[in-house]
Amino acid sequence: EQIQALPTYTIAQKGIGYVPEDQGIFAGLTVEENMKVAIQKDNEETNKRLDYILNLFPDLKKFWKKPGGLLSGGQKQMLSIARAYVNENELLLIDEPSKGLAPIVVEKVMESILQMKDQTTIVLVEQNFMMASTIGDCFYIIDDGRTVSNGSMKQLKEDEEMKRKYLGIA
């Protein structure tokens, strides 16, 4: 199904969550309000999921009543991911979750995404090779907007040109 021309709310209603590269949070709203804006169904199941998310991202619990604009870059990224994940979407599109984050924060975000991938399908766009190779099952190498290769990490590593040119492995 083609969804490019659909309004954002229609895409969300179809069970697709999106985490933009720029984090897309409301800086003037508290963490709690940012989460409430994202929630489509306020029911017991959503409340359980919210508890699960707050365990995945304990920093969000600490800053629950603080404006999103006061969060660090990593905390904003966690909030952005949490907002997309709270509605039990069938598909999460996550764009560059490690961009601009300190290595320790990248690790926390990566661990959280690893836990989430057991419960939902995730399409991850990521230039951080370590993060992508840890999280991913199936990989697409895109160069200048074109898919130049795809497969498992094992398959990609077997291709000497792919290793040298795209994976940064000598």
What residue spans do the PLM features occupy?
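ABC ATPase NBD Q-loop/coupling interface
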Residues: 1-13, 153-155
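ABC-type ATPase nucleotide-binding domains, specifically the catalytic core motifs of the NBD
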Residues: 6-8, 31-48, 56-61, 151, ...
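Helical segment within the ABC ATPase nucleotide-binding domain
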Residues: 106-119
